[in-house]
C-alpha cells in the first residue's frame, strides 16, 4: 500500500482530551477519529489490525467447534422485557421507537436474541451441545465515555453462546472456551490474567474475566505472587485467620466518646488501635435490616456480601433507619445486646483479642467486649475487601494488586435466560427441559487498545508481529532521487510478491518526517532506502529492539521471511 494515497493522517500534538496512551497514539498515528463522544471512525490502519485480531479469534473458536453467524443489532423490546433486563439495564440500554411506535433496543449483548432463535430452531437433545458466535458492533449509552476505545458508546465485540443438556456438558464447553481465550490473548501479544469475577447483570453463577495488565486499567486485579490464584477486587479472597486459643476480655466497660463519629475518632478517644474497634454497618439485605461487623481498618465488599449471603439486593440503611432500630446514630452502633437483628461478622473478627465497639447509645462505646458473652453472631462471612499483602487463599504466597483492562469474560448462565424466555428442548425421555447456557465475550476494539497500552514507547506504537497492520514500513527517503525511487519501487514489488504486507512511504516529505511517522505507526520492521541506494544497500531497523543493520537489496526478502517467522 502506497502511503501517498493511504488514509492515515498522522498528528504531531497530543489531543488535549485524550487521557489514555492508546487513545493518544491511535489518534496521532491516524488510526481513528472521533465522530461524537464515545463514537469513533476506524481508519484503514485500525481496520487492518482489527481484521487480524478477528482472524485469530475465528481460528481459535472454529478449532473448538463453534459456528459463526450474524444476529441483528435491532432488538424488539419484548425479548428484553421477558428476561427482565429492559428495566434492569437502565439508561445504558439504547432505546428507540419505530414509525409504528414499537419499542426496540440497540443490542449491547445478545442473550435474549440468541435464546429466542435457538428456542425456535432446536427441539431435541440430539442437536446438543451447540456453540455459536458472532463479531459485531454493540451499543451502550455510557454516562461518561472516556479512554478512547476502552469505554465507548459503540464498540466491536465477539460474543458466543453455548447450549447444553447437562451441567457436565456446560462445564466442558466453559473450560474449552477458557483455553481458547488464553490462546487468543497470548497470540495477540497481551500480558493478561484470567480472574474470578462477579456475573453482575448478566446473571448465572461461575464466571472469569480476562484482564490485560495496564496502568490505565479501571479494574484492580488481585493475584498471588506464589501461585496462579487471581480474582478481581470485587471477588478476591484472602486466607482466613484462626481464632486465638485463649480470649481474655475483662469486664465490659462503657466509656463516653462524645466527639467520635468515625472508627479513627473512636480509636483516638479510647486509646485503641483502629483495627481493634468494630466497624458496625447497618445494612438492608433483601429488605431485612441487618448488622455487619468488620475490623476497623477493613472495608465492606458489597459484591462479596451479596454472594456470601445468597442475596439479591443490598443497601446501606439510612440514618433514620439506624436510629429507629438501634436508638443511636451510626458512629455509636455495635452488636452488644442486639437481639432481633441478624448479625453477620467478617471472619477477621474471630482473631480479635482486644475489642471495642459502639454502645448503641450516641456518644458512647464499650471496651473489653467478649464474643458469646456480650453478643452472638448469626453467621461469620467473608465480607471485607482484601488488602495488598494479605495471605493468598490457597496458602501460597501473598496477594498483590495490579491495574487491568477487562478484555473478555466467560459465564455459566445456567437456565437464567432459557427459563425467562421459555426456551426448552426434549430430553431422552421426551420431557421438556430448559437449555443450560454459557456466554462468552471478547471486546475486540478493547483488545486493540489494550495491545497499544502494553506495546508502546516514547516514540509511538510498537506492534506485536501477529496484529501489526503491516509487517514492513518501506521508506523512500528522497523520492526526487532517481536511484532511491527506483530501488524503493523494486523492493516494494519484491516484498509484495513474497506475500508480506508492506506500507510504502512514497510521499514527498523530508526524511525526518518519515522516520517520525514510521516510529509513531510502529510497524515491526522499517526499511529505509537512502543515500546508498546506488550501491544497492538499504538500512533495516527492528522497531521493538532498535536493532539496525545494512543489507543488500537482494538479501532483504529472505531476511524478512526469517524475521517474521521467529
From Swiss-Prot:
Keywords: Aminoacyl-tRNA synthetase, ATP-binding, Cytoplasm, Ligase, Nucleotide-binding, Protein biosynthesis
Domain of life: Bacteria
Subcellular location: Cytoplasm
EC number, as in UniProt: 6.1.1.15
Catalytically driven reaction(s): tRNA(Pro) + L-proline + ATP = L-prolyl-tRNA(Pro) + AMP + diphosphate
Entries under Pfam families matching the protein: HGTP_anticodon (PF03129), tRNA-synt_2b (PF00587), tRNA_edit (PF04073)
GO BP term (any one): prolyl-tRNA aminoacylation
CDD domains cross-referenced by the UniProt entry: ProRS-INS, ProRS_anticodon_short, ProRS_core_prok
Main location: cytoplasm
NCBIfam families, A to Z: PRK09194.1 (NF006625), proS_fam_II (TIGR00409)
Assembly and binders: Homodimer.
Family: Belongs to the class-II aminoacyl-tRNA synthetase family. ProS type 1 subfamily.
Note on domains (UniProt): Consists of three domains: the N-terminal catalytic domain, the editing domain and the C-terminal anticodon-binding domain.
Protein name: Proline--tRNA ligase
Organism expressing this protein natively: Shouchella clausii (strain KSM-K16) (Alkalihalobacillus clausii)
Gene: proS
